């Protein structure tokens, strides 16, 4: 998720990214770009911009996905890791599940619906109280990441509104084409190979 404070910043960032990839493909940009480099471009284009890695557990391309190549946020964002203070959990997990992983303790956890799935818009959301503003919202998330008292802030982060994680596509392992659904321990016992067709599972 990329946030910039003004429309002018958004236009500047869009122009820069259009030189790198396709911004019009099916509602989601296709960029041949590492996440760290996208963060650097965003920071250069817009003062006050914020990046929140989204759907962090999705297997294929997400920050902590099994196929991403990263085990830690620092492996992905390198020298710019300090600019990441929040993570979006995705539909297949919720903040309570993520809080079981101590390395995520220093991050605010947010939940969002997919903007490219209009029928499901709003099934997950972030709850704020107080006077909404761009700066206020991110100040509240930064305070939440540091476990600081938010009572003096104009805008406070209260938490998230969650759908049922077990309804998420990636809550359990499996192979959709073969209608196979397994607990992770059972997938590991099978070497993450579908027992029906012999192909890798997600």
Locations of regions flagged by a protein language model:
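Charged catalytic cores and adjacent phosphate/nucleic-acid-binding surfaces used
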Residues: 1-25, 40, 59-202
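Noncatalytic, typically N-terminal accessory segments of nucleic acid-processing enzymes
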Residues: 28-31
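Active-site-adjacent beta->alpha loops and helix N-cap segments on the catalytic face
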Residues: 35
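Active-site acidic/histidine clusters and adjacent loop/turn architecture
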Residues: 39-46
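Short, structured loop/turn "capping" segments at alpha-beta junctions
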Residues: 49-50
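Short, well-ordered beta-to-alpha junction loops that form the rim of enzyme active sites
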Residues: 53-57
């Amino acid at each position: 998720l990329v946030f910039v404070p003004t429309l002018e910043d958004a236009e500047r960032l869009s122009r820069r990214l259009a030189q790198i990839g396709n911004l019009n493909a099916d509602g989601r940009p296709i960029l041949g770009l590492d996440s760290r480099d996208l963060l650097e471009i965003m920071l250069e284009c817009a003062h006050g911009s914020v990046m929140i890695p989204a759907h962090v557990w999705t297997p294929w391309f997400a920050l902590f996905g099994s196929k991403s190549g990263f085990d830690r946020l620092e492996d992905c964002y390198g020298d710019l890791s300090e600019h990441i203070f929040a993570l979006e959990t995705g539909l297949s997990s919720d903040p309570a599940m993520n809080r079981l992983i101590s390395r995520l303790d220093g991050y605010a956890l947010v939940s969002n619906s997919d903007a490219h799935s209009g029928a499901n818009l709003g099934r997950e959301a972030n709850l704020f109280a107080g006077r909404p503003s761009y700066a206020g919202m991110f100040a509240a998330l930064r305070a939440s990441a540091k476990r600081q008292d938010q009572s003096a802030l104009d805008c406070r982060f209260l938490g998230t509104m969650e759908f049922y994680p077990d309804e998420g596509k990636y809550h359990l392992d499996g192979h959709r084409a073969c209608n196979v659904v397994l607990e992770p321990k059972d997938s590991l016992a099978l070497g993450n190979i579908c027992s029906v067709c012999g192909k890798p599972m997600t």
